């Protein structure tokens, strides 16, 4: 791992996302891309009506731009070997970013439907889950095509365990959980971004 490039990439990601926030949030307010709050629940939730939505666009843009910059920095410094292991690691990293973009697209469509319909329901939960499962399946398929067929997971202090075919189920559920964790815990207005 190239520590300087990783630190630069993380700082760049934070900076880009914060800068985009200063630009995007007022623009979203001006465009009236606000969240509609349900009538059920405490009365004080109504004060959040109209809070800008689609904030995930800032995070996705920050990740993609900083990832590209990090790859460019590592390539320019000779840290990326495009033969063998280096190219396989790069392919895996790119597939992870593409997966994040695809999840971001699902969130964008969900928010867009909410804004267009002026209601708090976008995609149906089952529609989101099906799309997310297909994205995860495409992610795993890209790894298998790239030659990464390992089903071993390393647990700190415990060692390595080979999950066999259950690897895809465990990891798939883990990814699905992480993608939906904020939505499940936010509950009020879906605006944790």
State the predicted function of each range.
Residues 1-193:
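"…together with the soluble PPM/PP2C metallo-phosphatase catalytic core" -> "…together
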